[in-house]
Amino acid sequence: MNFMKNLTRGIIRENPTFVLVLGMCPTLAVTTSAINGMGMGLATMLVLIGSNVAISALRKVIPDNIRIPAFVVVIASFVTIVGMLMKAYVPALDAALGIFIPLIVVNCIILARAEAFAFSNGIADSFADAVGMGLGFTLALTILGSIREILGAGSIFGFSLFGAAYEPVLLMILPPGAFLTLGLLIGLINWKTKKA
């Protein structure tokens, strides 16, 4: 398969959040700010890259009847590594994301890419697919977190945009704000793609 096609597919055409609507639990829960969205996206991308490459490399030795438990073990190993690195180097982000880092193990984006792509493709294509899907997920979470942070706190990446006079829309940093923002973004993307 074409390396660049695999790389770019997950960013726009098959974006995990806006098109495939996968990974909704972390998407809705951690995107209260741009940095949280970006951090969760990057952590997921690292796990996705590691697990896709490992599963692709091991695909000929993993028996078909135990492939899902094998995928979970591989994914859990990479989640543990990423979790330990986050605790060591970005403890504030790790604390903000909390339980959602360990829950990457059962994130349907990672399991779906392992099952649908990495288990039946070579290492280079699996790497490209993981990077593309990971970038698409990171981009989606960062956009969602940015919109919610701007409207809900009047800041972006922690920097104040509007000063003390700004009246934040508190709904935007609460769960209903996540649903509202995600729904509007998905609707906008669907409208734009249907129009094109």
Swiss-Prot record:
GO terms for biological process: electron transport chain. The chain crosses the membrane at residues 38-58, 68-88, 92-112, 127-147, 169-189. It is an enzyme of class 7 (translocase). Its main location: membrane. Its EC number is 7.2.1.2. GO terms for cellular component: plasma membrane. Keywords: Cell membrane, Electron transport, Membrane, NAD, Translocase, Transmembrane, Transmembrane helix, Transport. The keyword Aminoacyl-tRNA synthetase does not apply. It holds the Pfam family Rnf-Nqr. It comes from the Bacteria. It is found in: Cell membrane. It is a multi-pass membrane protein. It catalyses: 2 reduced [2Fe-2S]-[ferredoxin] + Na(+)(in) + NAD(+) + H(+) = 2 oxidized [2Fe-2S]-[ferredoxin] + Na(+)(out) + NADH. The complex is composed of six subunits: RnfA, RnfB, RnfC, RnfD, RnfE and RnfG. PANTHER family: ELECTRON TRANSPORT COMPLEX PROTEIN RNFE, ION-TRANSLOCATING OXIDOREDUCTASE COMPLEX SUBUNIT E. Part of a membrane-bound complex that couples electron transfer with translocation of ions across the membrane. Couples electron transfer from reduced ferredoxin to NAD(+) with electrogenic movement of Na(+) out of the cell. Involved in caffeate respiration. Belongs to the NqrDE/RnfAE family. This is Na(+)-translocating ferredoxin:NAD(+) oxidoreductase complex subunit E. The gene is rnfE.
